[in-house]
Amino acid sequence: MDDLDALLADLESTTSHISKRPVFLSEEPPYSYPTGNHTYQEIAVPPPVPPPPSSEALNGTVLDPLDQWQPSGSRYAHQQPPSPLPVYSSSAKNSSASNTQDGVGSLCSRAGEEEHVYSFPNKQKSAEPSPTVMSSSLGSNLSELDRLLLELNAVQHSPPGFPADEAESSPPLPGALSPLYGIPENNTPLGGKAGPLVKEKPKRNGGRGLEDVRPSVESLLDELESSVPSPVPAITVNQGEMSSPQRVTSSQQQTRISASSATRELDELMASLSDFKMQGLEQRVDGERPWAAGWPPSSRQSSPEGQDEGGFMAQGKTGSSSPPGGLSKPGSQLDSMLGSLQSDLNKLGVATVAKGVCGACKKPIAGQVVTAMGKTWHPEHFVCTHCQEEIGSRNFFERDGQPYCEKDYHSLFSPRCYYCNGPILDKVVTALDRTWHPEHFFCAQCGAFFGPEGFHEKDGKAYCRKDYFDMFAPKCGGCARAILENYISALNTLWHPECFVCRECFTPFVNGSFFEHDGQPYCEVHYHERRGSLCSGCQKPITGRCITAMAKKFHPEHFVCAFCLKQLNKGTFKEQNDKPYCQSCFVKLFC
């Protein structure tokens, strides 16, 4: 410690003439080491200014620039052997050099958490100090700035609106980087490997809100800005490899952070503190399927060591130490999630009014609601009574107070087609005490659809007019076609009026009198002709006495000699060439 005090005294005496406004070397292109969300930019170490002693002279060792960027316990692949690191707390030291180190260490810790870039100058400065750089001394403003930084560090670790534990008992920040100066964890060395950097969130205390911390921080910011003149001086932090004897020299790598950058970082910190609760709430709402995410919202518990819940919420996790061992039923998980959501909303002062009671599960509805059949339902509970599928926005049918999807309703309750036995979904034809699809109701004989004339039924089947009369209507005795309208009944047969005529000459019968021969109607002439009862002489029917000769029939007065025309009433005649002759005429003509 004596060597350290001597070293700090030398540093203060040799840097007393340096201006509080060093040159900002922003034009040099730095290169950086990516470390997660942080970027540290490292530049070659500038040569020592001639008046102050060099780093080698003070420490007696030669430092390799690459070794200077190997912080113990950091996330880089090559690690330095563990060595005791300086411990910085939020309490002020007596000496001004210690105050400077504490204040700068706290500022580096806060700035590192806010994900800003630290720049190191990469330009070889000349041995002669620039006129614009030189000034009388750091003065009282630098000491005032150190004091404000110490107070800011104390406020950040123990804000007035939230109770804070002492540095020795508080749990470590999750994933704090060892190159950043922080508070040791229960006397544990800071050389261990740390996790990823996570923003520190204040603890909740009862019903106090996050806005309770704003007045003190904003007043500190106003005091900080008023105490630092413009242009704002950069705070130079000598960062190098830490060994047992602490070595801090002006020739090592320098880190500068302006007051405007610190103000911007604190504004972003306050914005994140104000929003972290709503982000945690949204993450639980988005995790509506807890069995898929593996973290049910209801399993949120506080750490037994009193860990800050906000730190876990920043990583998108709840405060439970491990995921659940098994999966419960989706219904119980949904109920647990809704109950947790309701309680969280009540804690935030958000009044939620149930939109009704579900008609299936009889529980209040807090999210989407389906209104149907005079009731309210959870969307997942409004299902088809038969297939149990969610109806959603599809059409449904109600029967006996129960909802059915369109498919099951038609399958169960719709009328069936007599032809195909399928359910009738749209238009229906009712005929012959049965129901039919319109496209399946057609003539049983020809398959034609029925027109305006309708159909005729025979033996339980439907026929068109033509096929029905062709198959089942009475047939005409004359033309053998169906009789559709008027008809004549004669000879035990039905006849079309135009078909009831003489079957020989097709002459209609006068006064309805006709002669029947072999079941067919004839006129008188053709009737006697068919029977052979016509007079061979006059070709008229014989109604009375007749003479039969030469296989013919004659009226008595018409049976005469073919030459002299005398009546052959005696019954004697001569026949020649199918003609009758008397005896005398026959002798004269043929003898």
Swiss-Prot record:
Where is this protein localized, as stated in its record? Cytoplasm, Cytoskeleton; Cell junction, Focal adhesion; Cytoplasm, Cell cortex
| Motif LD motif 3: where in chain | 216-228
Name the CDD domains for this protein.
LIM1_Paxillin_like, LIM2_Paxillin, LIM3_Paxillin_like, LIM4_Paxillin
Give residue numbers for sequence motif LD motif 5.
333-345
Q: Where is the composition biased (Polar residues)?
A: 121-137, 236-261
Alphabetized SUPFAM superfamilies for the sequence: Glucocorticoid receptor-like (DNA-binding domain)
- What taxonomic ancestry is recorded? Eukaryota, Metazoa, Chordata, Craniata, Vertebrata
> What are the start and end residues of every segment in region (Disordered)?
17-139, 156-261, 289-338
Q: Does the keyword Repeat apply?
A: yes
Task: Please provide, in alphabetical order, the Gene Ontology terms of the cellular component aspect for this entry.
Answer: cell cortex; cell leading edge; cytoskeleton; focal adhesion; lamellipodium
Fill in the PTM field for this protein.
Phosphorylated by MAPK1/ERK2. Phosphorylated on tyrosine residues during integrin-mediated cell adhesion, embryonic development, fibroblast transformation and following stimulation of cells by mitogens. Phosphorylation at Ser-244 by CDK5 reduces its interaction with PTK2/FAK1 in matrix-cell focal adhesions (MCFA) during oligodendrocytes (OLs) differentiation. Phosphorylation at Tyr-31 and Tyr-118 by PTK6 promote the activation of RAC1 via CRK/CrKII, thereby promoting migration and invasion. Phosphorylation at Ser-250 by SLK is required for PXN redistribution and cell motility.
Assigned keywords, A-Z: Acetylation, Cell adhesion, Cell junction, Cytoplasm, Cytoskeleton, LIM domain, Metal-binding, Phosphoprotein, Repeat, Zinc
Residue interval(s) of motif LD motif 4: 265-276
Say where the protein is mainly found.
cytoplasm
Single GO biological process annotation from the record: focal adhesion assembly
Q: What is this protein called?
A: Paxillin
Cite the record's note on assembly.
Answer: Interacts in vitro with VCL/vinculin as well as to the SH3 domain of SRC and, when tyrosine phosphorylated, to the SH2 domain of CRK. Interacts with GIT1. Interacts with NUDT16L1/SDOS. Interacts with PTK2/FAK1. Interacts with PTK2B/PYK2. Interacts with ASAP2. Interacts with unphosphorylated ITGA4. Interacts with RNF5. Interacts with PDCD10. Interacts with NEK3, the interaction is prolactin-dependent. Interacts with PTK6. Interacts with TGFB1I1. Interacts with SORBS1. Interacts with PARVB. Interacts (via LD motif 4) with PARVA/PARVIN. Interacts (via LD motif 4) with ILK.
Q: Where is this motif: LD motif 1?
A: 3-15
Q: Which Pfam families match?
A: LIM (PF00412), Paxillin (PF03535)
Functional summary from the UniProt entry? Cytoskeletal protein involved in actin-membrane attachment at sites of cell adhesion to the extracellular matrix (focal adhesion). Recruits other proteins such as TRIM15 to focal adhesion.
Residue ranges constituting the LIM zinc-binding domain according to the UniProt record: 356-415, 416-473, 474-533, 534-591
